[in-house]
Amino acid sequence: TVTLLLDIAYIDYAGERQAVRKFFKKISNLPANILTIVAYSMSKGFTMYGQRTGAMIGVSSSKEVIDEFKGINQYTSRATWSNINRPAMKTLATVYKDPELLAAVQKERNDYYEMIKARADLFMKEANECGLKCLPYIAGFFLSIPDTDPEAVCSKLHDDNIFAVPLKAGIRIALCAVPLKKIGGMAAKIKAAQDAVHK
């Protein structure tokens, strides 16, 4: 059996609601030897960070595979985590029972998506203008900038009060945490820090 894990933690911030979910059709009739596991994070989609609530959904064309998936998880998940937290379960049930509340939640998610997209659009435009090389940005809370010495570049950025996250092979910028007014000029400062470190 081949297991495919789809991490959809940030799907609510990845684009137009229906468009970003179209790929689910591709996993509905796969061969019986493929089990797709969809990992969903309620803490992201419902902006409930710290609540540690989500779902692991198994999808297979084989009833036998799904029965095994269900049986295994019924015991191992319960033994590992006991039960998920009650306030998050209650929130989910309350929101989905009330069409007006659900519409308000979906509007709020879309507003956050548009806010982050505006930040990304500005950053990528300025990165292009100043020659800062970035990985392509499609959607999400973060963008990445390749670098061979991310620790040194991030340390240099502290001089400009920019606190990025050094990764193994680059720098992560948290678009979700930086207001639009502070995005302007950031790409040029990162490029200058890279140039200073790699001169």
What is each PLM-predicted segment?
Residues 39, 133-138, 164-167:
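Short beta-strand
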Residues 86, 151-199:
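PLP-dependent enzyme catalytic core of the Aspartate aminotransferase-like
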Residues 1-20:
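Catalytic PLP-binding core of fold-type I/II PLP enzymes
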Residues 3-5, 37, 142, 170:
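Structural preference for beta-strand elements that scaffold enzyme active sites
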Residues 104-157, 177:
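Conserved PLP-binding catalytic core of the aspartate aminotransferase-like
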